[in-house]
Amino acid sequence: MTHITFGTSGWRGILCEDFIFENVKVVTQAIADHLIAAGEKGGVVIGYDPRFMGDSFARESARVLAAAGVKSFLCSRDTPTPVIAFEILRRKAAGGINFTASHNPPEYNGIKFSPSWGGQALPETTKDIEKRANEMLGEICYREISLEQAARQGLLEEIDPREAYLADLEKKIDFDAIRKIGALGVNPLYGTARGYLDAPLLARGVDIRLINQHRDPYFGGFPPEPAEKYIADFISLVKNDPAIKLGIATDGDADRFGIVDGDGTYIEPNYIIALLFDYLVRVRKMSGGVARSVATSHLVDAVARHHGIELFETPVGFKYIGELISQDKIIIGGEESAGLSIKGHVPEKDGILACFLVAEMVAREGKSVGQLLEELYGRVGRYITKRENISLSPEIEEVFPARVANLPTEIAGAKVAKIIRLDGTKLVLTDGSWLLFRKSGTEPVVRLYGEAATTGRLAEVMKAGREFILKG
């Protein structure tokens, strides 16, 4: 029997194995029971990405909600995650159910639940839903009615939130400036950003080179992640077309971004977050704090110090950053895994917003991303990051908790200045370098993150991190 577990971004499973209609109905019933117990009213926005059966899962979910007396606002087509968050807030809904596995391979699907404040559900919420769902597994504890009956009872409404979201985006992005950039490469990666990432640009007469613009549940045969190793076709397009000054891409559900500079160089998300933070303060004159996850580059910290701005360090998971955005405490918050949002926008990762912000920055500054990054290094110092997955033998996996409980006072030739156990174990060294060890909860793997001022020093730090994991 499947055990329902909500991870960092919801419950995910493999289609036809554990992600089946029966389990989807159980989880939906658990969400309905949670909302009713909490006294939440206002209905639930239901969306899905382009994966197989996404629309069918969404309709079955609406049937269960209707039987529980909860109204559904069912998206008429596959819809970006940040747009679902926007619609929750716009309609003052009780929450949102999103059928997506984000950047995971095509054989996966998932349920992401968002509460009424529009961000990712916090642990106390997901634990309650998880508990309710697992108590129901193996029993027919849900009710459902037909979609026709739900509609007659006023418990089902089909919606298309695209126009309202794009109209809101018009207020937050200087699209007129983007017109001056030259040609843009645009890559929605067969995902939900089709018609979102291109339409505002075309409406302004921006010259774009659009690829991967049709729905494909296989996402072209790769995980729908706009990371360097999965977008070789897009990088080649940008590199080989001299008219293109910037390439922008999103993942399958459009909550993550990918940026390719005009010369074909892929720019890591860590650097984009820091650049946009600096841009929002220096050019847009925005005020407030900044947030990053524990695994994200300290280049963000350096920019914060440069501008005299408070920094919040959070566990991994955008839900914690989203909470700070909803509380109006920060200008921008971001994660190294290519998620960010800004003050006044949805408290959820928005890859569409991120792409347009980068395009605006490049257009208004009149410089490439690479040039802007070098200038930022000149002001605040250089930071180089790396991440590796280290596989553990059964013997090492058994002793690893004891290793991170008894840490050295010196590693990689520098003393440990600070230990942070916010999410995993992070060692900040006296020379500004740092290491983070995060054990996977589902497999015998430690995620090793490191950062230093030079590639040589980073190699030393990462080597020391690997040796600590494997040898102690």
Residue ranges and their predicted role:
Residues 73-82, 266-269, 291-293, 314-315:
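Active-site nucleophile and cofactor-binding loops and adjacent substrate-binding regions
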